[in-house]
């Protein structure tokens, strides 16, 4: 019997209900006005403020994705530096399991969710596009934006940080998620619901089976025992 089965099932139900609240209604029901209002709010700001235009352009440049990796790496590094050699190895392996989980859930989400939709910049007409207002390389559109894969990866990171390093670290990771995921919404490359519905659906249905069961711990232990190297956490067991 899985110890946290009631919590897992509840989170799965919430995730499914969240998705169906968006998927079943005609034109996505109450979600579409929310999506449209958020898009038009930020889209109008692009021509009202040059500073905002540049902010959105730069935070959607591919180099900014590297900054998100740096932020995640620095947070993990702060714990890695405090550990002894076996503990450092275990943190690295935890990162490997986190990456593996992100890849699997992202692929499952893309394959199983029966949705394909273009970003708001490719849906609405008579709008402002950063790529037309500035000559800066930036991502302001997507032909298939649902679910938001970038937001999903950052949410998985946040959940792993919460699970293995505590609530405060999890909250810091959530700040990283907001800072690096929502510029995609501000520029119009993603709908708000690509993240709040799409990414969250995959997270609520898939991730509890990894983090609220022994699976993640067992994977970490397996890789610790199997991968070459010194300072294995379980080498004397």
Where are these regions (language model features)?
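N-terminal transmembrane-helix/juxtamembrane module of multi-pass inner/ER membrane proteins
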Residues: 1-71, 110-140, 228-237
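Aromatic-anchored segments of alpha-helical transmembrane domains
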Residues: 17-22, 99-104, 177-188
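Alpha-helical transmembrane segments of integral membrane proteins
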Residues: 9-10, 89-98, 169-172, 193-197
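Membrane-interface helix-loop-helix junctions at transmembrane boundaries of multi-pass membrane enzymes
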Residues: 2-6, 80-92, 162, 166-168
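Membrane-embedded catalytic cores of phosphoryl/pyrophosphoryl-handling enzymes
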Residues: 2, 132-237
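Interfacial segments of alpha-helical transmembrane regions
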Residues: 71-110, 203
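Membrane-water interface at transmembrane helix exits
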Residues: 39, 43, 73-77, 105-114, ...
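Hydrophobic alpha-helical transmembrane segments
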Residues: 60-80, 150-153
């Amino acid at each position: 019997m899985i110890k946290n089965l009631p919590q897992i099932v509840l989170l799965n139900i919430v995730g499914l209900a969240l998705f169906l609240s968006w998927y079943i209604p005609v034109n996505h029901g109450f979600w579409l006005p929310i999506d449209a209002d958020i898009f038009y709010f930020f889209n109008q700001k692009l021509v009202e403020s040059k500073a905002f235009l540049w902010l959105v352009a730069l935070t959607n440049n591919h180099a900014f994705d590297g900054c998100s990796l740096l932020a995640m790496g620095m947070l993990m590094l702060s714990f890695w530096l405090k550990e002894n050699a076996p503990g450092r190895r275990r943190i690295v392996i935890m990162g490997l399991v986190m990456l593996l989980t992100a890849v699997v859930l992202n692929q499952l989400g893309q394959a199983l969710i029966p949705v394909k939709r273009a970003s708001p910049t490719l849906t609405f007409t008579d709008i402002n596009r950063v790529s037309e207002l500035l000559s800066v390389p930036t991502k302001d559109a997507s032909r298939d934006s649902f679910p938001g894969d970038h937001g999903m990866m950052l949410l998985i990171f946040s959940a792993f940080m919460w699970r293995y390093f505590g609530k405060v670290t999890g909250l810091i990771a959530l700040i990283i998620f907001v800072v690096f995921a929502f510029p995609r919404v501000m520029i119009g490359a993603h709908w708000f619901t690509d993240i709040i519905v799409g990414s969250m659906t995959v997270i609520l249905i898939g991730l509890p089976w990894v983090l609220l069961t022994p699976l993640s711990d067992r994977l970490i232990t397996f890789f610790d025992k199997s991968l070459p190297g010194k300072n294995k956490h379980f080498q004397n067991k």
